[in-house]
UniProtKB/Swiss-Prot annotation:
Record text on cofactor binding: Binds 1 thiamine pyrophosphate per subunit.
Enzyme superclass (EC): transferase
Reactions it catalyzes: isochorismate + 2-oxoglutarate + H(+) = 5-enolpyruvoyl-6-hydroxy-2-succinyl-cyclohex-3-ene-1-carboxylate + CO2
Free-text function comment from the UniProt entry: Catalyzes the thiamine diphosphate-dependent decarboxylation of 2-oxoglutarate and the subsequent addition of the resulting succinic semialdehyde-thiamine pyrophosphate anion to isochorismate to yield 2-succinyl-5-enolpyruvyl-6-hydroxy-3-cyclohexene-1-carboxylate (SEPHCHC).
Protein name according to UniProt: 2-succinyl-5-enolpyruvyl-6-hydroxy-3-cyclohexene-1-carboxylate synthase
Key words, A-Z: Magnesium, Manganese, Menaquinone biosynthesis, Metal-binding, Thiamine pyrophosphate, Transferase
InterPro entries: MenaQ_synth_MenD (IPR004433), THDP-binding (IPR029061), Thiamin_PyroP_enz_TPP-bd_dom (IPR012001), TPP_enzyme_TPP-bd (IPR011766)
Length: 543
């Protein structure tokens, strides 16, 4: 069987990648045809074909976030590569090993006005350094790049392919799945001393990890952080900021002496106030090159701890009381009919329906904050969310990538493990094209996407933009109502659709998806005009 030099190079590129990968996302194109045919001839790779490079890159991101190993997205030259920038940006800031493998014209065509030709070298800048492969002797650069901390960042592999691109015969099937060679590499910032006899609070966010020495310390944990042994509700931060409270003649200090930040917490303004309070000693623990210190006053930075002393019982009681006050306040406010059916009610229903072994993907903006307020993280439930740059784009594709990665872990099970995604309506519509899955492609077998549809940007109701004095221009600039018929949208893409107008409707629909798995979208029709008052009431419960 004859092959072209371009096909020979493509084969060597995929061969260099194959020890590190299990999945490939492939986009149609001419210049990348040698890479496409080579990938489809490999029996050791799961291939997912998508026609939109932007969606494809986010699908690869969703897969890679769960697998914690590289997932390449392969495309042709030109703007096809540019469309990967949003996913690359999230991957870079979330330290996810996304690989963009782009086909390119040979060097002699760059700058000549040749069709579909741009300078693709370093197109992503420092976010994803370019590895140029223009000849077989360059292929070794791929292994070198993957060995130099690719686990901490995305990479761009730019493969220059000259004509003729492909021979008239298909390559033979080959490749045998073996163990994937990929080791997560972390940055070690050293060890820090921690005196637990002081009033200490841990704040854990995305990219946090379990630290045995701090297990007994009261912890505000975001949904994507490990489950805390001694959890503190995030709204309790407002209570802890009081400094002192008095009752029955006693004065109790509520402000912590020492805060330990683990990972990358970003969700709640009250928590941010604690982190940036210059009167509170701050230690930041990180295993990446990102140090989460928004107030720029960290006293110490490390990756490991050496502890002395024990937590004071009085401090533990204060944190428990503050957390209980916040959690009870959430339940009381949600029970009030005057607030209607909001996104927070949707999050509560989703949380209540989760079981051990379920996986959650949550879009940025209100949904992830709402899940945090209603109690996540839960034991036995993994939560994934784009917290690197916290954008809503690519959410549908990432949710699908999450579900596909989870079901690939259990190929022999009759029923794939359940994945539940919570998205706002703008996040869903923004990436509606992610619903397009070809008839020959792997499909999620047990994915439920819940869309909290308040017909616009509900988060802006809670921010300064929602102030009464700005209402006359709020809807057009921030509310951005769209009136999209989500039922018709799902029908166009062949996705099962359900509608929930009330909390009870939603609970029933979620229960049905447990009994009858598949790929389903549930639209929860909510209101947003009460969100500002609801949030104000929640905050008042702990102030």
């Amino acid at each position: 069987m004859s092959v072209t030099p371009a096909q020979e190079l493509a084969r060597e590129v995929i061969e260099a990648l194959s020890p590190h990968i299990t999945d490939v996302v492939l986009c149609p194109g001419s210049r990348n045809s040698p890479l496409s045919l080579e990938v489809l001839s490999r029996e050791d790779l799961r291939v997912h074909v998508r026609i939109d490079e932007r969606s494809a890159a986010f699908l690869a991101l969703g897969l890679a976030r769960v697998q914690r190993r590289p997932v390449p997205v392969i495309m042709t030259s030109g703007t096809a590569v540019s469309n990967c920038l949003p996913a690359v940006t999230e991957a870079a800031h979330a330290h996810i090993p996304l690989l963009v493998v782009s086909a390119d014209r040979p060097a002699h065509l760059i700058g000549t006005g040749s069709s579909q030709t741009i300078d693709q070298t370093d197109i992503f800048g420092a976010l994803a350094p370019t590895v140029t492969v223009a000849a077989p002797e360059h292929v070794g650069r791929i292994s070198q790049a993957l060995g130099n901390g690719a686990s901490q960042s995305p990479r761009h592999i730019n493969v220059a392919l000259d004509m003729p691109l492909v021979a008239p015969d298909l390559p033979e099937l080959h490749g045998q799945r073996g163990p994937v060679d990929w080791e997560q590499r972390w940055v070690d910032h050293g060890v820090v001393d921690v005196d637990l006899s002081r009033n200490t609070l841990v704040i854990a966010g995305d990219e946090a990890w379990e630290i045995e020495e701090l297990a007994e310390v009261p912890t505000i944990a975001e949904p994507t952080a490990p489950v805390a042994y001694h959890p503190v509700h995030p709204l309790a931060a407002e209570f802890l900021l009081k400094d002192q409270v008095s009752a029955e003649g006693y004065v109790v200090t509520t402000r912590p002496d020492h805060i330990i930040v683990v990972g990358h917490p970003t969700l709640h303004r009250g928590v941010l106030k604690l982190m940036t309070d210059p009167t509170i000693e701050l230690t930041v623990l990180s295993r990446t090159d990102v140090i989460t210190d928004p107030g720029r006053h960290a006293d110490r930075v490390g990756s490991r701890v050496k502890v002395t002393g024990e937590q004071q019982k009085q401090w533990l009681k204060i944190c428990d009381a503050a957390s209980d006050l916040a959690a009870e306040g959430v339940r009381e406010v949600l029970a009030k009919e005057e607030h209607g059916f909001t996104g927070l009610h949707v999050a509560a229903a989703v949380a209540d329906g989760l079981g051990t072994g379920d996986t959650v993907f949550c879009a940025a903006s209100n949904p992830i904050r709402d899940l945090s307020i209603v109690g996540l993280p839960f034991a036995g439930v993994d939560v994934h969310s784009p917290r690197g740059t916290a954008g809503i784009d690519g959410s549908v594709s990432q949710a699908i990538g999450t579900a596909l990665a989870i079901q690939a872990r259990h190929p022999d099970e009759i029923r794939a493990p359940r994945t539940v995604a919570l998205l706002g309506d703008l996040a869903f519509i923004h990436d509606a094209g992610g619903l397009l899955i070809g008839p020959d492609e792997p499909r999620p077998e047990n994915l439920t996407i819940v869309v909290a549809n308040d017909n616009g940007g509900g988060i802006f109701e809670l921010l300064e933009t929602g102030a009464p004095g700005l209402r006359s221009r709020f809807e057009r600039a921030f509310g951005t109502p769209h009136d999209v018929n989500i039922s018709d949208l799902c029908d166009a893409y062949g996705v099962d659709y359900r509608r929930a107008n009330t909390l009870q409707d939603l609970l029933m629909e979620l229960e049905d998806t447990i009994e009858i798995p598949g790929f389903t979208v549930i639209e929860a029709v909510t209101v947003r005009d009460t969100r500002r008052a609801l949030q104000r009431e929640l905050t008042a419960k702990v102030r």
